[in-house]
Structure formats: structure tokens, C-alpha cells
Amino acid sequence: MAHRRIALAVLVTLLLSAFRPCLAQQSNDDTSKHHRSATAGGFTPTTVVVLVALITAFVLLTVFSVLINRCAQARAPPRRAFRSTASHQPVGGAAAASRASRGLDKEVVEAFPTAVYGDVKARMAAKSGPLECAVCLAEFADSDELRVLPACCHVFHPDCIDPWLAAAVTCPLCRANLTAPPVSLAAAESSDLTAPEEAVQEEESEELDEASLMATFTPESVIDFGATHDHEFDRAGYPHYRRTQSAMDAAPDRHTLRLPEHVMKELAADRRHRRAASLAGYPDSVERTPRWLTSLWRSVSWQRQSRADWDAGEEHGGSKRVHPVAGAQDETPSGSGSDGSKENSDSDALNRV
């Protein structure tokens, strides 16, 4: 468009400059007849040449601009298609960033191992403690369903972890990338076996250091040591601190579940079989319970459990409650004999308590 405007401006300017001598010649009455006879239509040869040159230049500019527009339009669709594919299907690092921003697909999340905690607890080792969800910080009940992340073996409630995985591709607890292939079970078991051995070796070396340090102490050296090097006592307490830290690190993880792969497959198959059997009798109850209702039920059950623990603490704290005795007689509203029997039964009940 800019080329066309420039060409039109140049053409108009040249036409005006060419018509000025023609108008001046037509105003001269003496030479008008000579110019009309010299040129057909009243134009001089110079004017005709200029007009032909301008028209030719205008045509060339028009053709050139049309060719440029056609070439631009021919190249535009591949660029737009590339941009659209790049925005929706990026390659390399951009693809990972796009997946990280939009999370995992629902099919991928549903493919993660799931099982019922009651079945899992029966297969777990006796030394391992109860598991709990790292999102809601609630212990799993025997009837709760748990989802295991294959990259780190952390367990969560499906209603707690599914919204997170819809917007992220990492574990909310350890930030492990769930799009990467999971670590093999053999490597995980080998690391679990080597970790206690390293902890034992470290504790033995610390005990030897402490024993050698205590063996060098004498009453005189202790007095001199305490008078001149007070800050060195921190080193004596350092092995104890290291052992405390190692004991804390060796504490059981309440958010990790490590079972053999075939066991997880068996648990998942049992869960699917139970679910199919339960839905066979109730075809209308295929839809899952809403997440907000499940969360509300968990909070209510937690409050009930806290209230029951508080009542139990009050009961064991020293205040005794009088419970009815099975053998006590019921109250009868007739006569003094009934009053006497009532007092006797109450006194017997209090004595028994």
C-alpha cells in the first residue's frame, strides 16, 4: 500500500508539471494553431514521451506490488500453522514447560496405582507405622482409597492429589517429576538396604570418637580444659547431636508406601473387582461422591474422634462417672418400702463403684 501511494503521488506531480506548458501554449492565440497542427490533440512530442514513461512506470510498480503481495500471502499460511503448532505442541524444553503449566492428563492420573488402605496395611511390614495423606494430614482409614505416585511412592487421597495433578506434574511433597520414568524397584530396595548400613557405620564411628575423647580426660585436664577452652565442650556434645539427627532421619516415613510391583498390581485388581461388584447391584450410583462432600465428612469424623478422645481423657483424669448397675432394682413409686429399697440399691451401686 505504501508503494502504491508513493507511485500515485509521483504520477500526479509529473502530470501537473507536464500540463502547465500545454495550458500556457493554449493561452497564446498566436501559436495555438501551429501546435494543434504539429501534434494531434494539442500535445507536444515531449509531453507524449513523458506520459508514456509515467504510465509505464505506474504499471510496473503496480505489477511489482501485486507480485510482492502474492508472495507474502503464499508464505503466510506456513508461518501461521507453525506458530499454532508451536503454541499447542511445543518441542523440547518448551513442551516440558507447557506440560508443567497445564498438569497431567486425566488418563495418566487414573493410570497411577490405587488400592484400599485396609488391604495395603495387611501386606505392610509390622514395624512400619500408619500412613497418612500429606495434603490433608489425616491418617488413612481401612476403607479409604489411596493413590500411589510411581516416581516417589508417596501416597495421597485421590480427592486430595487429583486437583494438584491437574495443574502440576510434580509431587507436592518432594517435587519429583511424574513425567519421568519411575525408579526401578530393585534400585529403591538397594538404596533402602544400604541406608541402614551407612547409618550403623556412622554411629559406630561417632561412638569411637566419643570413647577416645572421654579416655583422654583426667581430673586435672578437665579443670584446665574447662578453664581455658570452654567452647570445646560443644564438640563433646556434637556426637550426641549427630546420633539424635540420625535417629530422627531413621524415623518411619508416614507418607511413603513401598511394596513390590506384583503386590500393587494384585491390590489394584482386587479394588477394581470390588468396585465392579458393588456397581453391578447399583447401576445408578456410578458417579463418584463430590469432593466437597468427602472433605466435609472427613472433617466431621475428625471432630468426632477428637471429642471422643477428650471425653476419654476426662474419664481417666480423676472424675468418676456413676454407671447404672445391671442388677439394681428399678424405681417404684409405691409406699415407703419402695423408697427403702431405692436407697439400698443406690448405696449398693455407689459401693460397687
From Swiss-Prot:
Q: Where in the cell is it found?
A: Membrane
Topology with respect to the bilayer: Single-pass membrane protein
Write the record's keywords in alphabetical order, separated by commas: Membrane, Metal-binding, Transferase, Transmembrane, Transmembrane helix, Ubl conjugation pathway, Zinc, Zinc-finger
ZnF (RING-type) spans are: 133-175
The biological processes this protein is annotated with in GO are: protein ubiquitination
What's the protein name? E3 ubiquitin-protein ligase Os03g0188200
Which PROSITE patterns does the record associate with it? Answer: ZF_RING_2 (PS50089)
The source's domain of life comes to Eukaryota
Q: Which organism is it from?
A: Oryza sativa subsp. japonica (Rice)
User: TM segments?
Assistant: 48-68
Instruction: Give Gene Ontology CC terms.
Output: membrane
Where do the coiled-coil regions begin and end? Answer: none
The record ties this protein, via Pfam families, to: zf-RING_2
Q: Please give the residue ranges the record annotates as the region Disordered.
A: 308-353
Q: PANTHER family under this entry? A: RING-H2 FINGER PROTEIN ATL16
| Keyword Transmembrane helix (UniProt) | yes
Its Enzyme Commission number(s) read: 2.3.2.27
Q: Does the keyword Transmembrane helix apply?
A: yes
